[in-house]
Amino acid sequence: MHSKPETIANVSVKEYSFSKKQIQGVVKASQFRWTFIWSFHKGLLTVNPPLGRALIEDALLRFLLKKDYELEAGNEYKFTISAKF
């Protein structure tokens, strides 16, 4: 039986600002690295650079929607993506 492909994404929260209503951070998966801004009051996620963004954007958004109230600046988090890249 084959195991499902997966990749571990590592999220580092750099800033969590209630006044700006946003979270800024870095997410790394495989050889890729992106910065992100999650404007939680607008439901808007910005991920840069665009290279490989399609690989991470939906999974990162699901993670942030599920965990945003638990996240703290300066902490590291992990989540699993059901794809290998």
Give the ranges of each region predicted by the language model.
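Mixed-charge, Lys/Arg-enriched low-complexity segments
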Residues: 48-85
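Non-membrane alpha-helical secondary structure
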Residues: 5, 15, 19-21, 48, ...
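Intrinsically disordered, low-complexity regulatory segments enriched in Ser/Thr/Pro
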Residues: 33-51
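Generic recognition of long tandem-repeat/solenoid scaffolds
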Residues: 23-29, 45-47, 83
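Short intrinsically disordered terminal tails
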Residues: 1-6, 82-85
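Generic structural motif
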Residues: 9-15, 45-47, 71
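Amphipathic, interaction-prone secondary-structure segments
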Residues: 8-38
